[in-house]
A protein has these predicted regions:
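The catalytic Nudix box helix
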Residues: 33-65
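A short, internal acetyl-CoA/4′-phosphopantetheine-binding micro-motif in the GNAT/acyltransferase core
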Residues: 37-40, 88, 103
Length: 103
């Protein structure tokens, strides 16, 4: 089974955590932590910084790795590396998501 490696940012600010709502694809409308697929040659930390810049147009501070979650979908195996992060620079701008909420 094919393994897909992704990264996810658990972005915190003022005691709340950011959730984003997908704006495209099979899971459109579903809520998630922002992130995405790793590219060849990237470290996990490089991937999460790049993905958040692409999706939300902000720079983040990666504070620590929280966990790696593995799950078997019918078509592939998912390996998701989750990081505790904060916004280091910029103002959130949704580039790929249809909505975002601080929870």
């Amino acid at each position: 089974m094919k393994t897909i490696e992704v990264v996810a940012a658990i972005i915190h600010q003022g005691g709340r955590i950011l959730a984003t709502q997908r704006g495209y694809g099979e899971w459109k409308g579903m809520w998630e932590f922002p992130g995405g697929k790793m590219e060849a040659g990237e470290t996990e930390e490089e991937a999460i910084v790049r993905e958040i810049r692409e999706e939300l147009n902000v720079g983040i501070r990666v504070e620590r790795k929280v966990c790696t979650v593995e799950y078997d979908y019918p078509q592939f195996h998912l390996r998701m590396h989750c990081f505790w992060c904060s916004i280091a620079e910029g103002v959130l701008e949704l580039k790929e998501h249809q909505s975002a909420r601080w929870l």
